[in-house]
């Protein structure tokens, strides 16, 4: 899946002149945590987050509620935002796994999606990536979810798929990943529609050297 397939299109954008208090209200009203800041032609100039707008704890002790309100009213997003050169971005043709790796590496919760000239065309957040992961594994449709552990060698996954073909079963979602703490094996998670747990158990248990480590009805 590519970023263009999972990003939020036409995200809410804000100008440099927006007051911090207005940015807080805009984010609360739209239930968002990240707000790209743009200049002329929707070109990215920065990024503001709820964390950036939060008043620091050491300041709370010296200001009363009216002073805090006045402080936020005087502040503009351009004074608080992550500056354009420091904003980590991604393009629509990159993969979702690359976006996940970038967000993990930089410990950030979103990536503005830009095209040539830093033109903002979308935004991808942690929620977007989690939604994509759910779709890859067949949510929200019902089916039997089975995890099969197999040796990490050529041909094992083909043998698993051959059984599914032989049974004429469809696949709603699939994912593979190395087994934790055991580099000699890996797990395949498959969601199969219109079957029973007993049918899947019987068919897949016949594959030599492959082990069903989890099986359940799932939605």
Put a short name on every predicted segment.
Residues 186-193:
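A generic structural motif
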Residues 178-186, 216-219:
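Short proline/glycine- and acidic-rich turn/helix-capping motifs at secondary-structure junctions
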Residues 199, 205-219:
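Short, charged, intrinsically disordered terminal tails
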Residues 33, 109, 170, 210-211:
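Residue-level detector of anion-binding/catalytic polar loops
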Residues 1-10, 50-91, 97-104, 116, ...:
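Tandem CBS (Bateman) regulatory domains
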Residues 18-25, 97-101:
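Short, basic/aromatic recognition patches
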Residues 14-15, 33-50, 90-91, 109-123:
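Cytosolic beta-strand hydrophobic patch enriched in CBS
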Residues 25-31, 102-106:
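Short loop/turn motifs at secondary-structure junctions and domain boundaries
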């Amino acid at each position: 899946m590519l970023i263009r397939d999972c990003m939020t299109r036409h995200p809410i954008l804000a100008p440099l002149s927006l007051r911090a208090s207005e940015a807080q209200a805009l984010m609360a009203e739209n239930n968002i945590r990240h707000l790209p800041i743009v200049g002329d032609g929707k070109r990215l100039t920065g990024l503001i987050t709820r964390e950036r707008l939060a008043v620091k704890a050491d300041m709370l002790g010296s200001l009363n509620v009216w002073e805090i309100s006045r402080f936020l009213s005087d502040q503009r997003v351009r004074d608080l935002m992550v500056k354009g050169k420091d904003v980590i971005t991604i393009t629509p043709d990159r993969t979702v796994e690359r976006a996940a790796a970038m967000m993990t590496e930089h410990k950030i919760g979103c990536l503005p999606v830009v095209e040539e000239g830093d033109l903002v065309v979308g935004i991808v957040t942690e929620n977007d990536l989690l939604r994509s992961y759910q779709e890859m594994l067949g949510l929200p449709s019902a089916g039997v979810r089975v995890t099969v552990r197999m040796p990490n060698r050529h041909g094992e996954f083909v043998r698993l798929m051959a059984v599914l073909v032989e049974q004429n079963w469809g696949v709603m979602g699939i994912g593979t990943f190395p087994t934790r703490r055991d580099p000699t094996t890996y797990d395949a998670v498959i969601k199969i529609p219109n079957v029973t747990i007993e049918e899947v158990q019987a068919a897949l248990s016949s594959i030599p050297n492959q082990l069903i480590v989890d099986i359940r009805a799932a939605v």
